[in-house]
Amino acid sequence: MAADSSETDASFDTAADGPLPVGVKLGSTRTVLYYPDEDGDPQTVRTLTCLATYEDALSGSERVVYGEQAAEEYPDRVQYMLRSGLPEDDDRADLAGTFFRELVKNQKIPADSAVVYAIPTIDNEAGLDNLAEVIEGSGIGDELVRSFPESLCGAIPAFGDDLEAIDEIFLALNLGSTNLEACAYRHGELMSPFSTGAVTGNETDRQIANMIEEETQGRVNVDVETARGYKEEHADFDDFEAFTDVIQQPGGGAHEFTIERSVMDPLDGYLDDVVDEVANNFLAELANDHMKVYQLALGRPIAVTGGMACIPGIVDELEDRLGEELQRDVDLVAPDRPDLAAAEGAQRIAERLTDD
């Protein structure tokens, strides 16, 4: 039942401190919780959004493991239950509910809490309703449960230490594992939301796996999880270095191989596709619908969040390519941890709502 990052037992005295403000981002690949400990210091829990069940050898009862433990110990039957950040049917909603209840129980998140969770900006009312049921049925959030767009939550840490983003007119890009999202905000109002599943981190991972087979002339086949690990560990737009790994071969023996192109070539194509979608689809639509907002927002920093934004140098490279495509200077800003930003921003909103 493992969660990586800060898996802490931060006993929060709700009687003395009031409801615990909690930010939540349930993602298709990873889930993040963000909340203060009893000293007010931020605590982060980041874990894979997956679970597996097994039968207890002694009692025969069903047991649940989630996150990294489930992925490592039960790769043959681990289940990822979200698509585009949402549980799309009743079965996946039940799985997501089990996962989230186990997570908050193990992190000792109290019922006396104020919960704000980030939601994708896609048109899927049934999925959003299912996600709401997952959060509301978890046993936390007695004080309040609210949702806000993920791109708004993620932009909050990018713009400062408070909630300055809510008072701004700006553009937000979310480079996610299952979607590329873009939208404009005018003082917190969502405008021209755009989402596509054609340009994603997951698809890039699949391309990396395919290119490794091609680069090694068919001698090496890796799964998507391994490809994602290579991307997260080695990808770098500033200073990529070729790396070597070893795999065990069927029948015994080991094979050492070196990767020179298979990580960065797919990422190079990914960025080109992001620029094309943002410049020629999202921004074209925004200019057509809200010309003044388009003009104002392009003259201000564009917030970039999502797991793909964690790759070193990718934000600067995206800034250069987008500016070249638009034939104007653009300024992209990202929080220190783009993958945690949505949960952090959601937590700040929860804190403000409990103060009001």
Task: Give short role names for the model-derived ranges.
Residues 31, 100, 135, 208, ...:
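Residue-level signature of catalytic and energy-coupling elements of molecular machines
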